[in-house]
């Protein structure tokens, strides 16, 4: 859902209010699920750091771009802070820093991708 949130809120060439609202709200609901899960345990799958944490963390790091407020999710906020300070996380994000300033998709890439999709749909 966070991916759809990013697509409709950031990348889509046409801003569709219904889609943006739907995915912002769905992301909010899922943040609530994560927050409730983390209320009684340190990590998503229990008391040990696991692939569940590794796989989920990158989807919640851009919480501001997803139009979420961490103040609404205190357990999720704690978990993000905990993972953010892990040496492996610090190292991984430092290695990715040179790429972070670049757009994930260029305008030409967007146009190609969306144009290709349109061509595919017209061919159906």
Task: Name every feature range the model reports, one short phrase each.
Residues 1-42, 64-66, 101-105, 120-124:
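Conserved C-terminal alpha-helical bundle
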Residues 36-47, 88-92:
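Surface-exposed helix-capping loop/turn segments at secondary-structure junctions
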Residues 16-19, 47, 69-72:
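Residue-level recognition of alpha-helical structural elements
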Residues 89, 93-123:
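Terminal-tail/helix-coil boundary detector
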Residues 2-6, 44-69, 77-85:
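GST superfamily/GST-like fold recognition
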Residues 5-9, 73, 99, 111-114:
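Juxtamembrane/interface motifs at transmembrane-helix termini
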Residues 26-30, 55, 75:
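Charged catalytic carboxylate motif
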């Amino acid at each position: 859902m966070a991916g759809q949130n990013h697509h409709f809120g950031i990348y889509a060439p046409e801003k569709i209010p219904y889609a943006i609202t739907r995915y912002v709200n769905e992301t909010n609901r899922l943040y609530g699920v994560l927050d409730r899960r983390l209320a009684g345990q340190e990590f998503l799958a229990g008391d040990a750091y696991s692939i569940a944490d590794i796989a989920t963390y990158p989807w919640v790091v851009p919480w501001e771009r997803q139009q979420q407020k961490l103040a609404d999710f205190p357990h999720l906020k704690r978990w993000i802070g905990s993972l953010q300070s892990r040496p492996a996380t610090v190292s991984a994000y430092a290695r990715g820093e040179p790429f972070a300033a670049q757009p994930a998709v260029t305008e030409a890439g967007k146009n190609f991708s969306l144009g290709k999709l349109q061509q595919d749909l017209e061919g159906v």
